[in-house]
A protein has these predicted regions:
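Caspase-like cysteine protease fold
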Residues: 136-151, 265-286, 290, 348-415
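Helix-turn-helix repeat elements of alpha-solenoid scaffolds
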Residues: 416-448, 487-502, 533-547, 587-593
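A domain-level signal for caspase-like cysteine endopeptidase catalytic cores
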Residues: 113, 154-264, 310
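Eukaryote-biased recognition of C-terminal alpha-helical segments
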Residues: 610-655
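Catalytic cores of nucleophile-dependent amide-cleaving enzymes
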Residues: 139, 143-150, 237-345, 570
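Non-catalytic, solvent-exposed interaction/assembly segments
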Residues: 1-133, 162
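Boundary/activation segment at the start of structured domains
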Residues: 2-5, 117-179
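Amphipathic alpha-helical repeat scaffolds of TPR domains
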Residues: 398-426, 452-483, 504, 508-529, ...
Length: 656
C-alpha cells in the first residue's frame, strides 16, 4: 500500500458559521503546514455560484442542460477554485515536495469555517501552475495521486475505531410518488463485496443466515426503522439509498433525504440531516451510543448545502458533525450508474482493508473514467476524520480481514472435502491455491524495517503461512485414498516440509517467538524428512523451553497463557529429541496436565487459548502418536485437563 502524505488546509473567517453570503470582498484566513497564515478571497458572488451549480444538475427549470454547457461550467469552476488554492503558498510548496516522493498518496484535509464555503465544490479544482498535472482536474490527474476530504472543525478530536468486524446496514426508500432507486443493484454490490467473508454452504438457502449476520437490509425504510436498527445492532457501515429533495425551513431552502413515512400508509417524508444523524447516533438500552465508522449517502444532494443563513449544513455535514468519522456523499445529482460504481468500489476495497483515503482517490478516478457516470467524479464529496494512527488502524483491520478470509476458505475446504471423492477433490485443491495466494500477498505486504515491531510482524505473517501449509497437509493426508493416494500423500509431505521451513524462518525473524520454534520442532519430530541445522534439534528444544519458561513470568495474561501452551507441547516433544527418557513419562504427563490447567485458570475454560491448545493435542493424538507410547500417555493427560468447548475455533484465531 502507498504511504500517505497529509496536508491540512484550513479556510477560516470571523463570525458564526451561518448568516453570511459568498462575496469576493470577504477575506478568508488560510492555515496550511507550518507556514504563516495567508489571506485569500473567493472571486464569486453567492448567486453566481448558485447559478453555476444549478447548471450542473442536468435539468434546470424543467429543461435539460446540454453536455457542452455542463463541461464548460466544470472547467470554469475548476479554474476558479484552482486560482484560489494557488494563492496558498504553503499548499503549493507542500504539493511540490510530495511530487518528489515515490509510492505516496497526497491527502488534503480541507477544513472550512462558514456555510457559504461549504457550497464551493473544491473537489473539481483544476491544477494551476505549481500543482501536479497542470491543467487537469487535480484529484484525477495521473502525475501524483491526490485525495481530498472535508472535515468539520471540532472542540476536541473525534475518536476513530477503524479496526472493527464489519456489520453493514443497507436502508433504501422508494415511497409512492418518487422514481425507482437501484436497490437491487446496490444490494448485489454489497453482497459481492462481502463474499470473501461469507462461509461456504452447499446451497444458497443455507448461506442466507450467514449473510444476514453481516448485512441487514431495511426495505422502503422509515426513519424509525433506521433508529430501531441502530439501537439494537452495532453497525460499522451504514449505506443509505434514497432520493434527495429540497425542503423549506423558516423560508430558507434546505436539502433532505426522502424516506418512507409509514409502512401502513406509505408516503414520502423529507428528512433533514440533523434528524437522520440522531437516528444513526441513537442510544441503545445499555446506554451505548450507536457509532458507525462510515456512512454512505447514496442520494442526490446529500453533500449539498442549502441556505447559508440558517444554522446547519448539508446532510453529510450534519451526520459528520454528529460524530460519524467518515461520510461519503454527493454534492450534486448522481447518476444511477455512478451510485452503483460508488457502492462497488468503496465497499469492495474498504472491506479488503485498503486505506480509505486511497479508496476515495481510486473511486473518483473510476467515476471520471466511466462515461456513463457523467460528472459524478465532481459530485463525490467525502467528510472524514483521519487521526495520526489511522494507517496503523487500517493495517490492523487489513490483517483482521485477511485472517477472516482465510478462516472462511479453510472452512470451505473442510466442508467440501467431506463430500469430495476422487476427482472431486480437485475443487478442494483449488481452494488451497486461493489460500496460498492470499497468504503470499499478505506476507509480501509485511514491513521491511529492521526494528523489533517490524520483525515481530514479519514473523507472525510467515508463521501464518506455515500454519496454513500444515493445515493443508493434514487435510490432504485425511483424504489420501484410491488411485491418487500416493500423489496425495506426497503433496502432504511437501506441505509439511514447507511448513517446517517457514516456521524456522519465522523464528529467525523473532528470536522471542517460542511458538514458531516449537512448531518447527514439532514438524521435525513427526516428519520423516528432518531438517539439517547448525544446532542439534535437542538444543533447539532447550532454547524453546527456556524462552517459554521466561515468558511464563510475564505480567500480561495472554502472553503467559500462550507460554504455558508452548510448555505443554515442548514437554511432549522432549521425548523425540532425547531430552527425556521413557521412565520420566508419568512425571512429564503430570507436568503437561498442570500446564494445561493453568491455561484454563488464566484465560477461562472456554477461552481461545484452551481451545487452540486442545486442538493441537488432538492432532498429536490422531495423527502422530500411533507408534509413540509416551506421546499417547501425555496427550491423554493433556486432553483430560483441557475442557472441551462447543464453540468453533477459527483457524487464524490461534495459528499453531
Amino acid at each position: 500500500m502507498r504511504d500517505v502524505y497529509t496536508i491540512r488546509l484550513e479556510l477560516l473567517r470571523f463570525g458564526p458559521a451561518h448568516n453570511q453570503l459568498l462575496s469576493p470582498l470577504t477575506p478568508y484566513v488560510t492555515l496550511c503546514g507550518n507556514d504563516e497564515p495567508a489571506s485569500v478571497t473567493i472571486p464569486l458572488e453567492h448567486h453566481h455560484l448558485l447559478n453555476r451549480l444549478e447548471r450542473l444538475r442536468y435539468v434546470t427549470d424543467g429543461a435539460p442542460v446540454s453536455e457542452g454547457q455542463r463541461k464548460a461550467e466544470l472547467r470554469e469552476l475548476g479554474s476558479i477554485v484552482g486560482r484560489v488554492l494557488a494563492n496558498v503558498p504553503a499548499l503549493t510548496a507542500l504539493l511540490g515536495r510530495a511530487s518528489g516522493l515515490t509510492n505516496v498518496l497526497v491527502h488534503i484535509q480541507l477544513v472550512v469555517w462558514g456555510s457559504e464555503l461549504a457550497l464551493v465544490p473544491f473537489e473539481i479544482v483544476t491544477a494551476p501552475q505549481g500543482f501536479p498535472g497542470v491543467g487537469s482536474p487535480l484529484l484525477t490527474q495521473g502525475d501524483v495521486p491526490v485525495a481530498l476530504t472535508r472535515e468539520v472543525r471540532r472542540e476536541r478530536p473525534l475518536a476513530v475505531e477503524w479496526d472493527r468486524a464489519p456489520r453493514i446496514l443497507f436502508a433504501w426508500a422508494e415511497p409512492p410518488g418518487v422514481s425507482r432507486v437501484p436497490a437491487r443493484e446496490h444490494l448485489i454490490a454489497l453482497r459481492h463485496a462481502l463474499e470473501p467473508w461469507i462461509p461456504w454452504r452447499p446451497t444458497p438457502e443455507l448461506r442466507v443466515p450467514e449473510v444476514q449476520q453481516r448485512l441487514t437490509v431495511l426495505h422502503n425504510a422509515t426513519l424509525d426503522d433506521i433508529r430501531r436498527a441502530c439501537r439494537t445492532t452495532s453497525f460499522t457501515h451504514v449505506h443509505l439509498l434514497a432520493h434527495g429533495a429540497e425542503r423549506t425551513e423558516a423560508g430558507e431552502r434546505q436539502y433532505g433525504i426522502i424516506l418512507n413515512r409509514d409502512h401502513r400508509q406509505p408516503a414520502a417524508e423529507v428528512v433533514d440531516g440533523q434528524a437522520l444523524a440522531q437516528a444513526l447516533r441513537v442510544t441503545s438500552q445499555d446506554g451505548k451510543v450507536s457509532r458507525p465508522t462510515a456512512v454512505t449517502l447514496a442520494t442526490c444532494d446529500s453533500g449539498a448545502v442549502g441556505s447559508p443563513l440558517t444554522p446547519g449544513g448539508s446532510i453529510a455535514h450534519d451526520v459528520h458533525a454528529s460524530g460519524v468519522p467518515w461520510v461519503i456523499a454527493s454534492q450534486l445529482p448522481m447518476t444511477i450508474a455512478g451510485s452503483v460504481t460508488l457502492t462497488e468500489c468503496w465497499y469492495s476495497r474498504v472491506l479488503m482493508g485498503e486505506d480509505p483515503r486511497s479508496v476515495v482517490h481510486e473511486l473518483r478516478r473510476s467515476l471520471h473514467a466511466d462515461a456513463r457516470a457523467k460528472h459524478d467524479w465532481a459530485s463525490l464529496a467525502v467528510y472524514a476524520v483521519t487521526p495520526p494512527d489511522l494507517s496503523a488502524q487500517v493495517t490492523a483491520f487489513r490483517s483482521r480481514q485477511t485472517k477472516a478470509r482465510v478462516d472462511v476458505l479453510f472452512d470451505k475446504a473442510e466442508r467440501m472435502s467431506e463430500q469430495a471423492v476422487g476427482p472431486g477433490f480437485e475443487t478442494v485443491r483449488k481452494v488451497f491455491v486461493e489460500i496460498r495466494q492470499t497468504l503470499k500477498d499478505y506476507r509480501a505486504e509485511a514491513p521491511v524495517a529492521d526494528g523489533p515491531e517490524a520483525r515481530r510482524e514479519r514473523a507472525e505473517r510467515i508463521g501464518l503461512n506455515a500454519a496454513a501449509e500444515k493445515r493443508i497437509a493434514l487435510l490432504l493426508r485425511a483424504h489420501a485414498a484410491g488411485d491418487s493416494r500416493q500423489q496425495t500423500e506426497r503433496e502432504s509431505d511437501e506441505s509439511l516440509t514447507r511448513a517446517r521451513d517457514l516456521y524456522h524462518k519465522a523464528f529467525s525473524e523473532d528470536w522471542t517467538n517460542h511458538w514458531a520454534i516449537t512448531q518447527f520442532l514439532s514438524l521435525n519430530a513427526v516428519h520423516a524428512n528432518r531438517s539439517g541445522e547448525e544446532l542439534r534439534l535437542s538444543d533447539w528444544w532447550t532454547v524453546a523451553r527456556s524462552i517459554a519458561l521466561q515468558q511464563c513470568r510475564d505480567t500480561d495474561p495472554v502472553s503467559r497463557a500462550w507460554a504455558f501452551a508452548t510448555l505443554a507441547e515442548i514437554e511432549l516433544l522432549g521425548f523425540a529429541f532425547g531430552n527425556y527418557a521413557a521412565e520420566q513419562t508419568v512425571d512429564i504427563a503430570a507436568r503437561v496436565a498442570r500446564h494445561c490447567r493453568t491455561i484454563a485458570e488464566i484465560m477461562g475454560e472456554d477461552s481461545l487459548h484452551v481451545r487452540a491448545t486442545r486442538r493441537q493435542f488432538e492432532r498429536y493424538a490422531r495423527w502422530w502418536s500411533a507408534d509413540k507410547p509416551q506421546w499417547q500417555q501425555i496427550t491423554a493427560a493433556a486432553l483430560q485437563a483441557l475442557p472441551q468447548s462447543r464453540n468453533d475455533l477459527h483457524w487464524t484465531s490461534a495459528i499453531p
